[in-house]
Amino acid sequence: MKKRTISLLLAALMLLTMLSACSGNSSAATTAAPAETTAAPVETAAETEAAAEMSYDELVELAKQDGKLVFYGANSYLQDAANNFAEEFGIEVEFTQLGETEMIEKIAAECKTGTPTADLVCAQDTYRVNTDLIGTGYAMNWTNSRITDITGETDCTAVIWQYDTKMFMYNPTLVGEDWAYNLWRITDPEYYGLFTFKAPTSEGVNLDMLTMLTSDTYAEKLAEAYKEYYGKDITLTTDNAGWEFVKMMYENGVLLTSSDSTCATTIGDVNLDKTWMGYFSTQRYSTQEAKGIKLAYDYNKATPFAGYTYPVYAVVLNGCQHENAAKLFAEWLLSENGYKAFETYFGGFSANPANAYATSYSFDDVKPYLVQDDADYLMDARVEMEDFLDSIQ
């Protein structure tokens, strides 16, 4: 009896399935099915999205209908980019320059209300972009195959449009070139109190850099460089040579400032009787003549690395008022005209390698000598670095 009941149920189910397959809209029901059928190709989600993607001209037209773009950023050069965008497309642009920490906090507060004032933010703190904007759902998830063709990234939630750099620099007035040949000199008691950089508490990318030093890759390089400088293996009081470097740097009288500009003028004073080192934006190197200071760095000679490189993101915000203008701006920043405002920005490189740069070397030239950003590691370790710094200051 039980088997018969199951058989009846299966038969009924098969009948329903057949009826369902034959049914559909009314016009389809009146059309006789051919004796042989060919299965329709299954379209992937990516293919569906690609087919639905608007062309560049369509995006431009919709952006013009938006009529306005409001965005925040930390780099003053973005004002020139805003002006160029407005001139090219006839779209009103409202740009506000804010410090990175203040900017992220402002954006997060606006997005929490569901109606952000800004449409887009140009941010550089990888950790905060991931935790405060992407992780919270405030960043819009979208794709653009034209951007993918340039950057290789299929996800436009945070479009990388530039790579910026910071370098360990020194004043060559008393010592000449190649003086900063090994970063452990920063920790040497002979040079106590002669190193400066912007306080990590007010500069997220500096906190990111310190965190990256503790990853296995860079900690191993620091351990090797320690032996080269001090002539012996490093004795650890922390987990690895990266943590040890940060600890010894702070113990050696580091001067924390409020800006990269202050760092540059502090170490670059031509009247100093001792040689200072500093870590700050590479762009400051190009301002030394105007400021009457002396700066030097040796990117391909410093051990174990010469500085740090980090991405700059264009993030379109969910709930923004001018979505298409924001998407157009993010894409446009990768174009020749979009990056024109940064052609003289010393130490910055477009994520589009075809665009111009101000240094005598390319990004591919300098990248092997720099600590590089790793979002996954930063997500795992940055909070620990924050706690560590609190414990040693």
Task: For the regions a language model picked out, list residue spans one by one.
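Short, low-complexity disordered leader/linker segments with a strong preference
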Residues: M1-D66, Q393
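Conserved C-terminal helix/tail region of periplasmic/extracytoplasmic solute-binding proteins
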Residues: A52, D364, Y369-Q393
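Short, polar/charged alpha-helical segment
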Residues: E53-K64, Y72-E92, F168, E289, ...
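Extracytoplasmic ligand-binding site segments that recognize negatively charged/polar headgroups
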Residues: Y72-N83, E94-A108, P116-G268
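Paired acidic/hydrophobic, glycine-rich loop segments that form the ligand-binding mouth/hinge
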Residues: T115-C122, L256, D273-S281, A296-Y297
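A ligand-binding cleft/hinge motif common to bilobed small-molecule-binding domains
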Residues: Y127-D132, T275-A296
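Periplasmic-binding protein-like
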Residues: I150, Y163-K166, F245-M249, K291-N318
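Mature extracytoplasmic/periplasmic domains
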Residues: G307-D373
